[in-house]
């Protein structure tokens, strides 16, 4: 689900909390050593999300916020901010030349550059949280 979060509304907060959980508290975020990525350069994006990025030949940025039951990808377009809300059960991550996140019939590919490499520990943390979440629903062990 993609929401325009330029102006925060109470209904949007409720939808986000229902899909990916409430935000981590200050103490929890310190224990996790951060819950957000640094901004990364978007290299490629699926055609059904292209309307949410800058149309001119400009660099597009996004960052990822970790929640207890999923992630939120913040996409910046000028002065607007769009949120792509992805529960863990929809999230698929591919490590190619850069990183590609797929969910809900959409994808976003981040460029393999310095800012991407600075986020290596964040992606390890993200994968660990996804594995922990998936183990809750592993009924065959």
Provide a role label for each language-model segment.
Residues 40-43, 47-51, 67-70, 77, ...:
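Alpha-helical context
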Residues 3, 48-50, 55-57, 75, ...:
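Generic preference for well-ordered secondary structure
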